[in-house]
């Protein structure tokens, strides 16, 4: 289904662009399979500074920008009645991830007292949405750091013409190629997902959680042409190409980075708070998508 054209490293910015050729398995009799779409896939910005990412997107000139969640940090405990236990009931946070985060929080607090560490500034998510939407049409799904959207978020999204897919799908056309794009949220709606899978045409699913692949898509035999996920942050620490830990899959996650059948998992374009990466650069994923040869 996919082949990788080695990542283009940006040594100064420490951000890479990973490239994949994607062949959609289902032919469309109404579309020439010679038509190739250039899709930018972004995941896990976490409200961080988007300037490096925006420079790459402008250079790549994609036909669409697809974002699979955690663009914004909207997970304040108690806001609009949301609680940690509520959101955790939808996802399976592993014991090892919880212990790992608690240890790092303690170390980070100590280092801050000695001026060795500091909290990274956030609040850049809306800047990214505003500027990236001028590069190409954007489709956005919801991740586990987006329990809610603020009124100013919604106003900007509407003004910029960004399509938010919160357990929803839509029909669009790119370069004469009809596509359905859907977004499965952390607070998942399985009835919608099953209905979406039955629809005709080529279907892309933005699904922040790669662990939902086995939990829902494989379990219920659902059919999608392409699934785009993030969340695992590439396994956080990667040795010999193997991710070590992810929030939803625990130790040695099965889906952490790369191509798994019809699913592409991004290592993400940023980090969550202070968690370091080793052997696991942040990445923008560029997809060259076309139909099967006849």
Regions found by a protein language model. Give the residues of each.
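Binuclear metal-dependent hydrolase catalytic cores centered on His/Asp/Glu-rich metal-binding motifs
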Residues: 151, 155-162, 168, 174-220, ...
